[in-house]
Amino acid sequence: MRRSAAPSQLQGNSFKKPKFIPPGRSNPGLNEEITKLNPDIKLFEGVAINNTFLPSQNDLRICSLNLPSEESTREINNRDNCSGKYCFEAPTLATLDPPHTVHSAPKEVAVSKEQEEKSDSLVKYFSVVWCKPSKKKHKKWEGDAVLIVKGKSFILKNLEGKDIGRGIGYKFKELEKIEEGQTLMICGKEIEVMGVISPDDFSSGRCFQLGGGSTAISHSSQVARKCFSNPFKSVCKPSSKENRQNDFQNCKPRHDPYTPNSLVMPRPDKNHQWVFNKNCFPLVDVVIDPYLVYHLRPHQKEGIIFLYECVMGMRMNGRCGAILADEMGLGKTLQCISLIWTLQCQGPYGGKPVIKKTLIVTPGSLVNNWKKEFQKWLGSERIKIFTVDQDHKVEEFIKSIFYSVLIISYEMLLRSLDQIKNIKFDLLICDEGHRLKNSAIKTTTALISLSCEKRIILTGTPIQNDLQEFFALIDFVNPGILGSLSSYRKIYEEPIILSREPSASEEEKELGERRAAELTCLTGLFILRRTQEIINKYLPPKIENVVFCRPGALQIELYRKLLNSQVVRFCLQGLLENSPHLICIGALKKLCNHPCLLFNSIKEKECSSTCDKNEEKSLYKGLLSVFPADYNPLLFTEKESGKLQVLSKLLAVIHELRPTEKVVLVSNYTQTLNILQEVCKRHGYAYTRLDGQTPISQRQQIVDGFNSQHSSFFIFLLSSKAGGVGLNLIGGSHLILYDIDWNPATDIQAMSRVWRDGQKYPVHIYRLLTTGTIEEKIYQRQISKQGLCGAVVDLTKTSEHIQFSVEELKNLFTLHESSDCVTHDLLDCECTGEEVHTGDSLEKFIVSRDCQLGPHHQKSNSLKPLSMSQLKQWKHFSGDHLNLTDPFLERITENVSFIFQNITTQATGT
């Protein structure tokens, strides 16, 4: 009987039928037929098992490291640049199969107990095709699947990892004899065994990748089309062959690849040439502009090569997407500008440019910053940049033939989507692309609708603790590389999350680790992340301080009153729904910043006749009686807030000791910025401000004015929500983070605004926390669960929304009045804070790569995300025994209960 082709075997050439071979050529003899029909004799004894369904994990073609040759990269040495190829070999279709033995029911075979125990521990995996039961000779198979045989039971999974059949009751000899070509009836489905899957391929998940996650090149979109040739051309003109020969002779690199320190891109291999060079153009070296190379640092040169290989489809079988996840301050913008300028002028095939038009989508506050960077590195004549704002519409870009780069904000993109869809962009760059972590939002949907295959995501923010967010980013740059979302969850997310559970078995842990490793291998080829350690030697020292401030008397009294409210008590008993705990948390955070913020909220709720939030009104009940009778929030005092009191003294000390240095003052809330602005006015500090109300067209001008050496501003008031991402504020050398956010990435981004390339002064960072309050609890959650240093993805699953157990809420809604620092108490540190404490030894955790989902071969000595154990290695100072050498901190000790300090020096980077 001729075996019908499986769906997976017909992909790409479904109309081609297997060659027919007469049955007589390979018809088994009569003795073989009798042997196969005898149940007491081993089935298919002479047939070898074909194990070529998927390559094993040891196959060097999987995630192989193809470093560029010396010819193609003459300037870059000693770099770790992997170029992986996924070679999946389809099993050879047999032209004539041996007779099939259809098992419709288990057979009665005597089995010893020893054999049964042995069979229970035996697990086998098979690739199969399945269909509904049919008596037709040539069956129509409905899909591919994976058959898992363990002992006397089996599980049938489709290529999305979903169970489509289970069974038990077969004798172990029945299941032990399963071989290629055998037909079985399982759960109302008829299956045919196509081959054996190795345990490595199953545990890594590679056996599921033949389906939706195929990395094959789409020929309809990738293959170069031949240009139209006019059949009525003049016979007097030179032939196309002669023209092509002339073109070949004139094909030379734009820049000399043999000059010292030249940066030459890798040449495409033969497979790439076969797909993308149908016209047989000569290979030409692609050389980065020497002017740009002169200013590039080694890690930036590596990043340009990485991006070039990704968008050219050299790293992954024609896939043209990339994620550049370098930490803040490593020059992602310059790397992209170099790539755009290179691809717009050069190409590996005949020197023809690879791209014509580029779309850059960025947060509104960075639109003008991108334009400024283009002008800085390329001038205003070499490349024409068009930025979209209220005065400059997309229609102007469409009408003009001079502009080649369109820079637009995410908000303006949604408004102008219809016009942008009509433009053919060859390259799409999404700055701060971590906002695309949800594939269902309008922004992501709009960008996906653009017909542009070359896509780059830039993000300095770690992708936060959600594998589905990670999938959304991966699927955006390289659609379908991980299959559908449902298959991704079954094959990768669920096993990985299950392996992290405390109750996970050893088998589940091993499976989760293997799936995580395979996910790392798949995605590491187009994800590049470097930490800030690689530029530490170029930066001045950084002194980071976590300052715990004692709350004021009014704050303590109000805090107690809030914790004793009926709403908080019901929260702790789990009696209320609709997340009232979030209202309580918000009220406590306002109180930590300043009591006047809480006073304003109480007054607003009392005056609001349409307010339906009874819980919030109940929470504020009786709080007004705690305030003085004549309390006026506009006439607030600094002593009412412990943090504001410390801030006021700190600003005065900096202004006195370093009058030429500037301060960046950051808050998450506009109302808090209003208070800080009033403090600046009272003390006569010159300030500028950037928040959500600042027009986008003015933001870059404000930043440039602050960074200018001739600026008279002393303080830059910054909203972390509006301007905490991407801004370069190297004009300031002191950064004060007034409040804390649940998302550690928000704080990290804000703190990275000043310690960047170009900073001339030592950087001082101060994080102000109210001792014993909810702010300290949030800080503990940051460093113990998520860390202060990013990874591309945290494989421990936590909820995207703020959800707490009753025990966690009890911890949050507790005021520790007797402790100078609850965080220090949790460290079990033996120091008393009377002198500098640096721990027994500074532990450095060696990790195999800079990000959890990155190439295994990239070694790094970078520290892991800051944990409670690492915080123990910081310097500890008690407020009662402050022996500080820091000239700023030693003069603000009056209301400080504890200080953690860490110094990153230029020499050691620690």
UniProtKB/Swiss-Prot annotation:
Q: Which residues carry this modification: Phosphoserine?
A: 14
Principal subcellular localisation of the protein: nucleus
Consequence of changing residue 593 to S: In a non-Hodgkin lymphoma sample
- UniProt binding sites for ATP: 326-333
Q: Where does the Helicase C-terminal domain lie?
A: 649-810
Example GO BP: reciprocal meiotic recombination
Which top class of enzyme applies to this chain? hydrolase
Query: Recorded E.C. number(s)?
Result: 3.6.4.-
Tell me where the signal peptide lies: none
Q: Where in this protein does the record put region Disordered? A: 1-33
* SUPFAM superfamilies documented for this protein: P-loop containing nucleoside triphosphate hydrolases (SSF52540)
Q: Which residues form a coiled coil?
A: none
Q: Which Pfam families match?
A: Helicase_C, SNF2-rel_dom
Mutagenesis / variant outcome for changing residue 418 to Y: In a colon cancer sample
User: Looking at the UniProt record for this protein, which Gene Ontology cellular component terms does it annotate, in alphabetical order?
Assistant: nucleus
Give GO MF terms, alphabetically: ATP binding; DNA binding; DNA helicase activity; DNA translocase activity; hydrolase activity; RNA helicase activity
Superkingdom of origin organism:
Eukaryota
Keywords assigned by UniProt, alphabetized:
ATP-binding, DNA damage, DNA repair, DNA-binding, Helicase, Hydrolase, Nucleotide-binding, Nucleus, Phosphoprotein
InterPro entries, from UniProt? Answer: Helicase_ATP-bd, Helicase_C-like, P-loop_NTPase, SNF2-like_sf, SNF2/RAD54-like_C, SNF2_N, SNF2_RAD54_helicase_repair
Entry comment describing in which tissues the protein is expressed: Abundantly expressed in testis and spleen. Relatively low levels observed in thymus, prostate, ovary and colon.
Q: What does this protein do?
A: Involved in DNA repair and mitotic recombination. May play an active role in recombination processes in concert with other members of the RAD52 epistasis group.
* Subunit (UniProt): Interacts with RAD51 through the NH2-terminal domain. Immunoprecipitation experiments show that the interaction is constitutive and not induced by ionizing radiation. The interaction may be indirect.
Q: Which family does it belong to?
A: Belongs to the SNF2/RAD54 helicase family.
The molecule here is called DNA repair and recombination protein RAD54B
Organism in which the protein naturally occurs: Homo sapiens
